[in-house]
């Protein structure tokens, strides 16, 4: 079994069900605000803030939703800036998927119990820390917008610059 539970003093005990966290988080924040703030913190490289908001997400049972968003974030924002990260995420993704498959989907507390899984916590915090520290490049930010006139032969000729230097 993939559930490695932690010391009882670090365990989150709460009687609320997963349905209680559809729109608001464990502490009563709006779900969309928490998730957007988490990714803004990652964008700005604020590790402590990102870890705080990640904790809020994990306590609220958003474990697998956040995991998918972190993978997409890596593909869209970091990708070639940290080429070793994709292999690291692949290995961690296998562990996360095995844990997800081991959860009884009919159990009312199954997904919420992931917040008390030591492996899941460690994987998430290490990935978020790495994402915070990685260089980021937004897709398409650095590329100029092209117009139809940019493809006219005359405009192309004007842009060619060739200096002839004879040795």
Question: Which stretches of residues belong to each language-model region?
Answer:
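Compositionally biased low-complexity segments enriched in polar/charged residues
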Residues: 1-4
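C-terminal alpha-helical interaction modules of replication/initiation AAA+ assemblies
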Residues: 11-23, 27, 32, 49-167
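Amphipathic alpha-helical repeat scaffolds
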Residues: 35-40, 55
């Amino acid at each position: 079994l993939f559930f490695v539970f932690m010391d009882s003093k670090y365990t989150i005990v709460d009687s609320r069900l997963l349905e209680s966290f559809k729109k608001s988080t464990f502490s009563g924040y709006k779900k969309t605000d928490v998730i957007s703030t988490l990714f803004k913190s990652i964008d700005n490289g604020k590790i402590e803030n990102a870890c705080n908001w990640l904790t809020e997400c994990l306590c609220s049972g958003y474990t697998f939703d956040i995991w998918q968003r972190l993978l997409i974030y890596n593909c869209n924002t970091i990708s070639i800036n940290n080429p070793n990260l994709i292999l690291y995420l692949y290995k961690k993704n296998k562990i996360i998927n095995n844990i997800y498959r081991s959860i009884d989907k009919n159990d009312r507390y199954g997904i919420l119990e992931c917040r008390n899984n030591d492996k899941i916590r460690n994987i998430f915090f290490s990935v978020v820390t790495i994402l915070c520290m990685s260089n980021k490049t937004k897709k398409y930010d650095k590329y100029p917008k092209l117009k139809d006139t940019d493809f006219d032969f005359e405009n192309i000729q004007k842009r060619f610059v060739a200096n002839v230097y004879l040795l």
